[in-house]
């Protein structure tokens, strides 16, 4: 079970890191979508920092399970918020955020079961 936890946590941490890099480097394929769902430009770096903290928490959480649980819960809430932002803006392109939310739920369940 712990091997599955490591695989899922590392994959999610990598996805979060790449997403954060896209925001911090103002990737032209990322920023317009964020603005379309109503994220103010000055808040975009804070979303990236939250993603990076989630990634670090998931990785540290492999050694200290309560941190992993807290990080997974935070990542779930982050992506639930992302899905809500898409729905509020009537943007139908929320599948990536929803998929990552499900992935974070899997990470949480695995971390709890392998604690």
At which residue positions do the language-model features occur?
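Membrane-interface extramembranous regions
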Residues: 1-115
